[in-house]
């Protein structure tokens, strides 16, 4: 049975069924590699039209020399919902670059409305692999009602193992279909 499931998963991935489960997707743009925020990552935690999306952030896959790269992880407040151009991450980036023009700082805002620490835990691992110079977590508003929270309608989990299993399963194409 495990071999059949593994074979089905591989076949679905090869045939392009489902979507990437990571927060960022590596792509080629002209002659350089970039990382683009995965607009479908919210499908892991929310059904269909209720899925939330990250901002359309794009950055070089390899951080340019001399540039500082900061990441903001969080919910709608971190995102700057409804006016992301006025989020604290955009203001932080502008303030640092205005105050110290010799230091180039980019602030990548990964805020997604309605998520909580179960989701942020997944994203933090991926962001830390990108070796940020600073990681800011602005969260706490959705712990009760967000995915796998005690009052959630999206993937209720009664314990840690159930939540982690559900999050892992959401990366499988067999579950996405």
Question: What positions do the PLM features span?
Answer:
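Short, well-structured alpha-helical segments in soluble
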Residues: 120-134
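Structural recognition of the beta-strand scaffold that forms the well-ordered cores
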Residues: 69-72, 106-111, 134-138
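Hydrophobic membrane-insertion alpha-helices, especially the h-region
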Residues: 1-10
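Structural motif
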Residues: 107, 113-124
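Membrane/wall-proximal cationic-aromatic binding patches
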Residues: 15-100
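Solvent-exposed loop/turn segments at secondary-structure junctions
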Residues: 76-79, 112-117, 141-146
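Serine-dependent acyl-ester chemistry module
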Residues: 86, 141-177
């Amino acid at each position: 049975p495990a071999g059949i499931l593994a074979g089905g998963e591989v076949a679905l991935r090869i045939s392009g069924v489902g979507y990437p489960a990571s927060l960022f997707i590596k792509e080629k743009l002209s002659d350089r590699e970039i990382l683009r925020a995965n607009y479908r990552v919210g499908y892991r935690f929310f059904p269909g039209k209720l899925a939330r999306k990250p901002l359309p952030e794009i950055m070089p896959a390899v951080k340019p020399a001399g540039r500082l790269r900061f990441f903001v992880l969080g919910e709608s407040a971190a995102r700057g919902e409804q006016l992301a151009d006025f989020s604290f991450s955009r203001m932080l980036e502008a303030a640092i670059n205005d105050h110290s023009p010799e230091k180039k700082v980019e602030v990548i805002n990964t805020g997604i409305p309605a998520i909580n620490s179960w989701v942020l835990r997944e994203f933090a691992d991926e962001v830390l692999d990108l070796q940020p110079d600073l990681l800011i977590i602005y969260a706490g508003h959705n712990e009760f009602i967000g995915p796998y929270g005690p009052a959630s309608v999206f993937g209720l989990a009664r314990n840690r193992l159930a939540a982690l299993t559900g999050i892992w399963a959401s990366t499988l194409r067999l579950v996405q279909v």
